Amino acid sequence: MATVPELTSEMMAYHSGNENDLFFEADGPNYMKSCFQDLDLCCPDEGIQLRISCQPYNKSFRQVLSVVVALEKLRQKAVPCPQAFQDDGLRTFFSLIFEEEPVLCNTWDDYSLECDAVRSLHCRLQDAQQKSLVLSGTYELKALHLNAENLNQQVVFSMSFVQGEESNDKIPVALGLRGKNLYLSCVMKDDKPTLQLESVDPNRYPKKKMEKRFVFNKIEIKDKLEFESAQFPNWYISTSQTEYMPVFLGNNSGGQDLIDFSMEFVSS
């Protein structure tokens, strides 16, 4: 960061009170003098002179800015001198005024990520056999065929777009149940990746940076979707071909288990 002190009283005596006058008097202190006379009288061998002392002075930011503006004006003037005023002169000038300090920042600000608004949509999912997902008991989803009279038993998911390893074919999402403090998560149970419904604090979830067990990579293949566990790659949200069986986490891609889903958007 840069810090700029104030001008000394001796220098202020030579400074013009007119805000439009950006220069010190030509007969001012030798340690800070800008010789800017009539350009026609400028010595062709000397050009525009700028004398700067390495001793630190007290300068307000406004006064330093005035000097910078003045130097910019001088640099842009067409002066018939052999040496043009270069940017290196400004760098030297700044090095005498400002002191560099490192500014450290974290790659990810966890607090900021938690406070960021999370984009979400509401949807229903059906497997490849058009079985709907319903809540059985408190913490279990099952897949079964529903008729028109009980279609309202389908769970509505709140699909949140979260931080993860995003690519062209994978979009990280979290799947919560609308109106409930429940999210699908993947954990290791009995040495096997397992899908479960996990209760969460509604004041903290959803958030942009979800724990990895809550994250699924949404993969779109033609008009179907797959949901791969971010915690356990190549393990997918799956249903059985048998009616009224629990939704589970499987790695039987291409086998008898169903991992393809269709999605129906639901208005909020």
Curated annotation (Swiss-Prot):
S-S bonds: none
Compartmental location: Cytoplasm, Cytosol; Secreted; Lysosome; Secreted, Extracellular exosome
Instruction: Cite the Pfam families for this sequence.
Output: IL1 (PF00340), IL1_propep (PF02394)
Keyword annotations:
Cytokine, Cytoplasm, Inflammatory response, Lysosome, Mitogen, Pyrogen, Secreted
Q: Cite the position(s) of the site with description Important for interaction with integrin.
A: 170, 180, 189
User: What is one Gene Ontology biological process annotated in the Swiss-Prot or TrEMBL record?
Assistant: vascular endothelial growth factor production
One term of GO molecular function: integrin binding
Q: Does the keyword Secreted apply?
A: yes
Q: Does the keyword Cytoplasm apply?
A: yes
**GO CC term (a single one):** cytosol
Sorted alphabetically, which CDD domains does this protein's record hold? Answer: beta-trefoil_IL1B (cd23296)
Q: Which residues form the propeptide?
A: 1-116
Q: Which SMART domains match?
A: IL1
What is its quaternary makeup?
Answer: Monomer. In its precursor form, weakly interacts with full-length MEFV; the mature cytokine does not interact at all. Interacts with integrins ITGAV:ITGBV and ITGA5:ITGB1; integrin-binding is required for IL1B signaling. Interacts with cargo receptor TMED10; the interaction is direct and is required for the secretion of IL1B mature form. Interacts with HSP90AB1; the interaction facilitates cargo translocation into the ERGIC. Interacts with HSP90B1; the interaction facilitates cargo translocation into the ERGIC.
Q: What does this protein do?
A: Potent pro-inflammatory cytokine. Initially discovered as the major endogenous pyrogen, induces prostaglandin synthesis, neutrophil influx and activation, T-cell activation and cytokine production, B-cell activation and antibody production, and fibroblast proliferation and collagen production. Promotes Th17 differentiation of T-cells. Synergizes with IL12/interleukin-12 to induce IFNG synthesis from T-helper 1 (Th1) cells. Plays a role in angiogenesis by inducing VEGF production synergistically with TNF and IL6.
Q: What else is known?
A: IL1B production occurs in 2 steps, each being controlled by different stimuli. First, inflammatory signals, such as LPS, stimulate the synthesis and promote the accumulation of cytosolic stores of pro-IL1B (priming). Then additional signals are required for inflammasome assembly, leading to CASP1 activation, pro-IL1B processing and eventually secretion of the active cytokine. IL1B processing and secretion are temporarily associated.
Q: Fetch the PANTHER family from UniProt.
A: INTERLEUKIN-1 BETA, INTERLEUKIN-1 FAMILY MEMBER
Q: What is this protein called?
A: Interleukin-1 beta
What is the source species? Oryctolagus cuniculus (Rabbit)
